[in-house]
Amino acid sequence: QWGSKTSANSGGLGGVVNIANNQKFNEGLILDARQTYGSFNTWGSYLTVGYSAKNFIARVKAYRNSSDNDFTYTNIATIPYQEMKQKNADFVDYGFMPEMQVRFKNSLLTFVSWNQFSHRNYPQIMPNVFNNTKEYADNDFSRNFLSYKYYWNSGRVEVKSSYFHEVQTYFLESYTSNGNPVTQNHSLNKSDVFRQIIDLQQDLYKSWKLYAKIQWDNEKVSSSNYDSSTTSSPKRNILSLYAAVDGKI
């Protein structure tokens, strides 16, 4: 839970989503392979391999999604109208996610790492077929999460630590019919985020519960879109405390 209703957490008023990712222990071998195919030559390949023991689970997910995204259209900007084919809108995403859970008597240790690499080409504007440009974007990230939960009959405490690293690249170049560059825009943006959370929940009396949380965020971004001599890598440190009592009168 990285956010929830405000009566039990410091989540947003606009609404948040809690994702349940509870693993099943003592299930033995984990093996799942899938292949999909769709329109515009779209392919999806997915593989999950792992093992589930009595108090230990380890698995790795790997995937690859790609599509050509080519399609025909009628270009009304030419005289006479022409049936043409739009190209260079392809994309590919691939990544892997190792996961591990270890269960002790009254505690649970969890580790998850989601790593993805993406490349997407952007086509020329459809009516302007003679515009010579090359345009694409890359988005790579690594999101890592470590959690230790200790629980007792009337409550629990959880310590969570995460590290998010992301790199976004945008490239746009226009060139002449001879292949000589005219303009170029190459943007590189990076972000690094550390997040540490201590979360406590304790039953008090009947339906009454105590919720408390301490959270520290350390964030750093850098971008080639700004002058490095005037704007260094911006940093932000946020320390937040939260406590609430919830129950029925």
Predicted feature residues:
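Residue-level signature of outer-membrane beta-barrel architecture
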Residues: 21, 50-53, 102-104, 149-152, ...
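Flexible loop and strand-edge segments within Gram-negative outer membrane beta-barrel domains
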Residues: 67-73, 83, 87-93, 107-157, ...
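Transmembrane beta-strands of outer-membrane beta-barrel proteins
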Residues: 29-33, 58-60, 109-111, 157-161, ...
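Transmembrane beta-strands of outer-membrane beta-barrel pores
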Residues: 35-39, 53-55, 64-68, 104-106, ...
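Outer-membrane beta-barrel transmembrane domain signature of Gram-negative proteins
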Residues: 137, 163-167, 175-249
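Residues embedded in well-ordered regular secondary structure
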Residues: 16, 55-59, 73-74
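A beta-strand signature from Gram-negative outer-membrane beta-barrel systems
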Residues: 1-28
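Hydrophobic, lipid-facing positions within transmembrane beta-strands of outer-membrane proteins
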Residues: 13-15, 29-31, 43-47, 94-98, ...
